[in-house]
Swiss-Prot record:
Species the sequence originates in: Deinagkistrodon acutus
Protein name: Snake venom serine protease Dav-KN
A GO term for molecular function: toxin activity
The entry's keywords: Disulfide bond, Hemostasis impairing toxin, Hydrolase, Protease, Secreted, Serine protease, Signal, Toxin, Zymogen
Taxonomic classification: Eukaryota, Metazoa, Chordata, Craniata, Vertebrata
Location of the Peptidase S1 domain: 25-248
Disulfide cysteine pairs (residue numbers): 31-162, 49-65, 97-255, 173-188, 199-224
Extent of the signal sequence: 1-18
Family per similarity comment: Belongs to the peptidase S1 family. Snake venom subfamily.
List of catalytic residues: 64, 109, 203
Amino acid sequence: MVLIRVLANLLILQLSYAQKSSELVIGGDECNINEHPFLVLVYYDDYQCGGTLLNEEWVLTAAHCNGKDMEIYLGVHSKKVPNKDVQRRVPKEKFFCDSSKTYTKWNKDIMLIRLDRPVRKSAHIAPLSLPSSPPSVGSVCRIMGWGSITPVEVTFPDVPYCANINLLDDVECKPGYPELLPEYKTLCAGILEGGIDTCGFDSGAPLISNGQFQGIVSWGGDPCAQPREPGVYTNVFDHLDWIKGIIAGNTDVTCPP
């Protein structure tokens, strides 16, 4: 009965978002069902985001994914045929940089969510560790998410799509984004020739470099996957002290300047 209810919810929500979105992983292929046990599907208001399971009680996503009536699904691959171990949670607490729900489009787009109850690990649900070192420019990065697989006309897959892109130097990003300042705690990643990218409803999903969780999908060009307009990601490594402090119960910890 629980699985039937989850299936019904996912199908209804998918139809709702198909009318409102035109964005997500562009230029990818279906993810292997076993490669994303940490990837969560976040629904709120009339929108969809991704997120990353850090441990049995915590999810990391983008601040602009905050909204009312938030539902968090874990263990999802196909929306039409959910895995038997799909679990649903709602937020117990939300934490933002500078103890504020406000954020700029360009910086500090990060939100920690404490779940209402612990998640049970299973075949399709497992956390992704925080990074132990910063990412290297030029490294291959893995992106993933549900949503439109075409940049203009909406084409939503039932399963998450994955793709490989490269971590770029900030200098390579600057021509497309003059508003991107050196002091921002962000990463720039993509393909300068275009054709592969994350997009709007992929917000909050992870950027994985050399097996480490290094970025959170934040913003980019419109339409997605255009030449010299790569994606911009919140830098997870730069926020480690804040993330670890909040999880440890230190709510007075501050974000990096």
